[in-house]
């Protein structure tokens, strides 16, 4: 398959992965309206083309939380990344470090903190869920700190798991799921060998380290699902803020009032996000939620965004809407599934090139030059 654009990796991933894994990363909640709107609404943002601006010294470099980035892109937390490629978290982290951007390890990664952190030459970020088992949360934070993690991404939009109907159809869950997954693996021999056999252990590395015994996909669906905490409130985050001395980012904000609460709480950053359309169907797309949040808190807190970003052009659009940087999820997972570390590295180069073309044609020499003035007003 020819990969000429960042968006080509989705089809390549579908050809490579067993259906239960492809549809797990590709799917969303309920009827997936928000999932579709994330990309559709972002694609509808019209950029304002400018000409004859002398764009010879263009730069994508930026700084977030005291860390220099080659471009305003972070590889965001994606659960079970190690099931898309052999030891997938390590491969993705290496590609990110090679490009000069951060990688964020998910709570529910296959590879544990202690395997990923030493594999790269820059501090990774770590994502943590709010769970009933506070002992696990403290253990994960202590281990992340010991591994040199400086930046914590705290996901707050998952007090309960989203209803992802596609998972039951694909074999990730539902009747006879284990048998269906095994049959799918047999019909995808390249994945079965490279990941299924050579990529073991297939457990939740961070959870296994805490529980002292191996975990499985059933634990991901079972133990983790019963551990999400619907009672969480801002006061429950106080001990984490006290414990974690580095930058703390609150991920999963869609409303300006919640963004203001994050500022009052003392968060260093927020991620405007609907969890990639995987939690509550029918909520605003990130592209439509971001401008009001930026108007409410821009300058008081670092603004990041995710959900629906598939290309360098999308990165430029999100920054014009008010973000200081973006997190990639599905986009890099597709590339990882298709071609491992090399696929992610190529994806990041494609995004770099796409950003440079877009910035040249809107007259923005630096990331700071991208603003609401870069958009055609009335078509946002």
Swiss-Prot record:
Q: Which residues form the FMN hydroxy acid dehydrogenase domain?
A: 1-380
Q: Give the GO biological process terms.
A: aerobic respiration; lactate metabolic process
Q: Report the PROSITE patterns cross-referenced here.
A: FMN_HYDROXY_ACID_DH_1 (PS00557), FMN_HYDROXY_ACID_DH_2 (PS51349)
Q: Report the active site residues.
A: 275
What's an example of a GO molecular-function annotation for this chain? FMN binding
User: Can you list the GO cellular component terms from the UniProt entry?
Assistant: plasma membrane
Q: Which InterPro entries match?
A: Aldolase_TIM (IPR013785), Alpha-hydoxy_acid_DH_FMN (IPR012133), FMN-dep_DH (IPR000262), FMN_HAD (IPR037396), FMN_hydac_DH_AS (IPR008259), LldD (IPR020920)
What is the required cofactor set for this protein?
FMN
Taking the first listed entry, what is the main subcellular location of this protein, grouped into a coarse class? membrane
Q: Where on this chain does substrate bind?
A: 24, 129, 164, 278
Which catalytic reaction applies to this protein? Answer: (S)-lactate + A = pyruvate + AH2
Q: What SUPFAM superfamilies does the annotation carry? A: FMN-linked oxidoreductases
List each coiled-coil range: none
Q: Entry's Pfam families?
A: FMN_dh
Tell me its EC number(s), please.
Answer: 1.1.-.-
Q: Where in the cell is it found?
A: Cell inner membrane
- Name the UniProt key words of this record, in alphabetical order: Cell inner membrane, Cell membrane, Flavoprotein, FMN, Membrane, Oxidoreductase
Gene3D superfamilies in UniProt: Aldolase class I (3.20.20.70)
User: From which domain of life does this come?
Assistant: Bacteria
Membrane topology type, per the record? Answer: Peripheral membrane protein
Residue numbers binding FMN: 106, 127, 155, 251, 306-330
Q: Which family does it belong to?
A: Belongs to the FMN-dependent alpha-hydroxy acid dehydrogenase family.
Q: What does this protein do?
A: Catalyzes the conversion of L-lactate to pyruvate. Is coupled to the respiratory chain.
Name of the protein this chain belongs to: L-lactate dehydrogenase
Kindly list the organism's lineage: Bacteria, Pseudomonadati, Pseudomonadota, Gammaproteobacteria, Enterobacterales
UniProt gene name? lldD
């Amino acid at each position: 398959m020819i990969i000429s654009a960042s968006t080509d990796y989705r089809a390549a991933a579908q050809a490579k992965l067993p259906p239960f894994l492809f549809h797990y990363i590709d799917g969303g909640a309920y009827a997936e309206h928000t999932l579709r709107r994330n990309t559709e609404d972002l694609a509808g943002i019209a950029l304002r083309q400018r000409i004859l601006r002398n764009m010879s010294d263009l730069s994508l470099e930026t700084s977030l939380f005291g860390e220099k980035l080659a471009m305003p892109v972070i590889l965001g937390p994606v659960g079970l990344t190690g099931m898309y490629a052999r030891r997938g978290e390590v491969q993705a982290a290496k590609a990110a470090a090679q490009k000069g951007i951060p990688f964020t390890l998910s709570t529910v990664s296959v590879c544990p903190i202690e395997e990923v952190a030493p594999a790269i030459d820059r501090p990774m970020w770590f994502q943590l869920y709010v769970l009933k088992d506070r002992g696990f949360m403290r253990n994960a934070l202590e281990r992340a700190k010991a591994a040199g993690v400086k930046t914590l991404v705290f996901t707050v939009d998952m007090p309960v798991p989203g209803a992802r109907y596609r998972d039951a159809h694909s074999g990730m869950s539902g009747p006879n799921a284990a048998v269906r997954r095994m049959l799918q693996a047999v019909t995808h021999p390249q994945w079965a060998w490279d990941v299924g056999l050579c990529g073991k252990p297939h457990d939740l590395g961070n959870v296994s380290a805490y529980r002292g015994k191996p975990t499985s996909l059933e634990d991901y669906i079972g133990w983790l699902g019963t551990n999400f905490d619907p009672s969480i409130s801002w006061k429950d985050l106080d001990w984490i803020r006290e414990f974690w001395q580095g930058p703390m980012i609150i991920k999963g904000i869609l409303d300006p009032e919640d963004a203001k609460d994050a500022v009052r709480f003392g968060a260093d950053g927020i991620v405007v996000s609907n969890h990639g359309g995987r939690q509550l169907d029918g909520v605003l797309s990130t592209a439509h939620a971001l401008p009001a949040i930026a108007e409410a808190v821009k300058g008081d807190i670092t603004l990041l965004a995710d959900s629906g970003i598939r290309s360098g052009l999308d990165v430029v659009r999100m920054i014009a809407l008010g973000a200081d940087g973006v997190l990639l999820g599905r986009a890099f997972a597709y590339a990882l599934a298709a071609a491992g570390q090399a696929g992610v590295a190529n994806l990041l180069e494609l995004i770099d090139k796409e950003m440079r073309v877009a910035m040249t044609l809107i007259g923005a020499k630096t990331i700071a030059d991208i603003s609401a003035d870069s958009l055609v007003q009335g078509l946002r």
